[in-house]
């Protein structure tokens, strides 16, 4: 019995279910289940959502098999970050690139599908009709992008230019619920200097405790070797 089959058997696989990652289904090349393809059908039939967070697994050499196939199966897809740096536009780009590599088809995953997953797909997963889109009665959550930014040029298709080229470099303003929280690329709701100092302090405390907490008593350089040892 696969994990998805088990959820179905328990009766908890519904349109309110959000499956984190959803990578190792019964037809993933790394698994050897008895009924390949049944998991995709179950997810689609029950209206469940897969929260696709590519970076955290790609760092380990693991990829969804694959985004375009899930979309074509009728599964609602959402996109998340799950690991630092939390950059939604970078995640969207990686979703597309990994899907095309795994599918061995550059046309398998469209920017339209990626943008949909990052907006409307996520809203649907949360059962929200007031977010994920710009319509009367919806929350005023939106970004303003500088289409004159060099990384956006030529701007024949601004969505593709934003996802595949510019990323957050071209983002000028961000509004959440109608409130401006980013202006000229800088967050207005955080004290960067204080946050950076607190982060450095926390890292120092963590590094000092690593040998005591690690099962083998290893130091930080043994667990996460520096790029250039000795520097």
Regions found by a protein language model. Name each.
Residues 1-49, 60-77:
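Histidine/acidic residue-rich metal-binding segments in metalloenzymes
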Residues 9-16, 49, 65-152, 163-167:
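His/Asp/Glu-enriched, well-ordered alpha-helical/loop segment
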Residues 22-23, 100, 148, 179:
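Flexible loop residues that form catalytic
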Residues 22-25, 55-57, 82-84:
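Active-site beta-loop-alpha junctions enriched in small/polar residues
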Residues 27-29, 59-61, 86-89, 152-154:
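Short acidic/glycine-rich loop or secondary-structure boundary segments that cap or lie
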Residues 33, 61-64, 89, 156, ...:
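Conserved strand-to-helix beginnings and helix N-cap segments that scaffold or border functional pockets
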Residues 36, 81, 85, 111, ...:
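Generic structural signal for well-ordered, non-membrane alpha-helical segments
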């Amino acid at each position: 019995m696969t994990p998805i089959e088990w959820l179905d058997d328990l009766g908890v696989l519904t349109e309110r279910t959000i499956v984190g990652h959803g990578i190792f289904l019964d037809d993933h090349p790394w698994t050897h289940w008895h009924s390949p393809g049944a998991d995709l059908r179950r997810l689609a039939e029950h209206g469940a959502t897969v929260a696709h967070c590519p970076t955290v697994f790609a760092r380990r050499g693991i990829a969804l098999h694959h985004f375009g196939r899930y979309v074509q199966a009728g599964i609602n897809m959402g996109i998340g970050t799950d690991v630092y740096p939390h950059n939604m536009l970078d995640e969207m780009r990686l979703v597309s690139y990994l899907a095309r590599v795994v599918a061995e088809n550059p046309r398998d995953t469209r920017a339209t599908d990626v943008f949909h997953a990052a907006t409307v797909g996520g809203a649907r997963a949360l059962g929200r009709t007031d977010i994920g889109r710009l319509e009367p009665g919806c929350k005023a959550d939106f970004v303003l992008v500088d289409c004159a930014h060099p990384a956006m040029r030529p701007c024949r298709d601004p969505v593709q230019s934003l996802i595949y080229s510019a990323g957050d470099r071209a983002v000028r303003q961000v509004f959440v619920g109608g409130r401006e929280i980013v202006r000229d690329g800088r967050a207005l709701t955080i004290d960067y200097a204080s946050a950076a100092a607190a982060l450095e302090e926390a890292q120092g405390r963590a590094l000092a405790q690593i040998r005591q907490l690690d099962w083998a008593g290893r130091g930080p350089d043994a667990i996460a070797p520096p790029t250039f040892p000795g520097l």
